[in-house]
Amino acid sequence: MIELSDAHRARVDAAIDRALARLTARCAPHGDGAQALAAAVSASAADGKRLRPALVVASFTAFGGDTAATPALWDVAAAFEILHTALLVHDDLIDRDVERRGILNVAGRFRERAHAYGADDRGTATVADAAAVLAGDLLLFEATRLVATAALTDDERDQLFAVLDEAILVSAVGELADAEHAARADLPDAHALLTAAHDKTAVYSFRAPLRAGAVLAGATSHAALSDAAAALGLAFQLVDDLIGTFGSRRQAGRDPGADLREAKRTPLIALARQTDAWPRVSDALAVAHTGPIAVRRAQREIEASGARVGLEELVHDNLRRARAHASSAELPPQAVVLLAALADAIERRIP
């Protein structure tokens, strides 16, 4: 995708570290539980690809911003990484996951902690859920605080709060829709699943950080940028769905076909349902949780249904839309180059 330079990564990481150190210091007087929560929060924000801060910085420079003259850039970029971490913590809670990237997440850490002091299964689950809710809440506030205290003009701050407000609200709407789709007795249609995929990820991961960078650089018109970024964000999420079904262990960061084993209701599955091959796909999905052989069978049936090609075409449609919006006369040449490069990078991720 897109990466921060070593120097820029160091500036973003320093801003994140300052925010987490502040949280740790504030939790310290409040006892062992608060200290454990601060440690879990810090661990959840460690490492990562820093995609969203990279988009903030790339957009800022593409719209003519001077990184040396804008110290607020690093706090705002860090805010989007902390927002991302908050949403991941809450997403793991909703999905009942206790690990992320093979490492115990906030809930997982507090499950172990509760077991250690003798909690029963119900108490352990309650403590783990509470810790994940509270950790995500603290991170959401910290992301907002970074923008509130950054060295910005009043107008910049107002615009950035509007961007952040939309990102958090739309992500919450998408997360709820995703949870309700998973709970329904019937499989939602492809449009509903596409809308949830867009809302859950595209706004906070692409549109918001790209707009934030443009605001910091003094851009006055964001319509074409917003439209291109929304299309890029949806394409990115759809490629993630393809990776979750067909990607390698290296691409997915977990066992191949994990989405099939976990019976996730993705746009890919909704497209398969619209085909005559659905009975065979459905039968294969019903046993995909049993092991690698069953996963491979489900992969073959989905591919034979044409759903994989159909989803790839949706990815390409959104990338074409993004490139069309990027060609708008209102965008500076470097912003056009940036959006085109992002579209190319997303295309290369297709498994």
Model-predicted segments: where are they?
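Well-ordered alpha-helical scaffold segments within catalytic/enzyme domains
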Residues: A58-G64, A143-A150, A208-L216, L271-D276, ...
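Short hairpin/turn module used for nucleic-acid contact or packing/dimerization
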Residues: R297-P351
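Conserved N-terminal diphosphate/IPP-binding helix and adjacent helical/loop segment
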Residues: M1-F80, T85, V89-A125, E175-H191, ...
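Active-site alpha-helical segments that house and flank conserved acidic catalytic motifs
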Residues: L73-R101, D165-A172, V203, R211-A214, ...
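Divalent-cation-assisted or electrostatically stabilized phosphate/pyrophosphate-binding catalytic cores
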Residues: R100-G136, D186-V203, R249-D276, A286-E313
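Residue-level signal for inorganic ion chemistry
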Residues: L55, A143, I269, A322, ...
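Hydrophobic packing residues in well-ordered alpha-helices of helical domains and bundles
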Residues: S5, R9-V12, L73-A79, G136, ...
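All-alpha helical catalytic cores of prenyl diphosphate-utilizing isoprenoid enzymes
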Residues: P29, A45-L51, A130-F141, A148-F246
